């Protein structure tokens, strides 16, 4: 399952390694764009609300939510819903931009993200983001900070409360 899939870049890239992928986004426009060049019967795109997913408990081995938790309201509620649909031995892959403590140039980039319709609702440092995941019932199995225009913290997690 990929949440906040946007145009489907990640799902399309990894589809050959999976039996089936459900890729969702809250934006009908993004899903329409993702469907436009989907060539795999193993990949299904749909408009869904990550806070109220239509899937049964423990439906997925892997959930990916990339670059989204910092822009959604109440990311802890999204994590609760992810925990519900993820199998007990499943893996959450949740890279997100970690803007807190950035330089002036980082603040300027955040301003332009807001203008583009992606306001920062959670401004974490890398350490703060990993702490947030742990406080919400996740054990961080792997993490790394990737330096780019915005620093990105990659987090690979498993349920800490099963």
Model-inferred region functions:
Residues 51-62:
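A short acidic, Gly/Pro-enriched loop at the edge of an enzyme's catalytic core
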């Amino acid at each position: 399952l990929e949440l906040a899939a946007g145009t489907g870049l990640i799902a399309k890239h990894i589809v050959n390694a999976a039996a089936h992928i459900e890729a969702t986004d809250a934006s009908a426009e993004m899903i329409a764009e993702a469907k436009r060049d989907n060539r795999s019967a193993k990949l299904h795109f749909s408009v869904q609300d990550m806070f109220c997913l239509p899937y049964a408990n423990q439906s997925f081995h892997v959930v990916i939510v990339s670059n989204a938790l910092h822009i959604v309201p109440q990311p802890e509620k999204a994590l609760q819903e992810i925990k519900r649909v993820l199998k007990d031995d499943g893996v959450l892959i949740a890279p997100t931009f970690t803007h807190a403590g950035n330089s002036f140039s980082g603040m300027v980039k955040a301003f332009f993200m807001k203008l583009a319709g992606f306001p920062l609702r959670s401004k974490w440092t890398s350490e703060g983001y990993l702490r947030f995941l742990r406080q919400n019932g996740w054990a961080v199995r792997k993490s790394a900070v990737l330096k780019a225009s915005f620093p990105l913290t990659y987090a690979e997690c498993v349920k800490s409360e099963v």
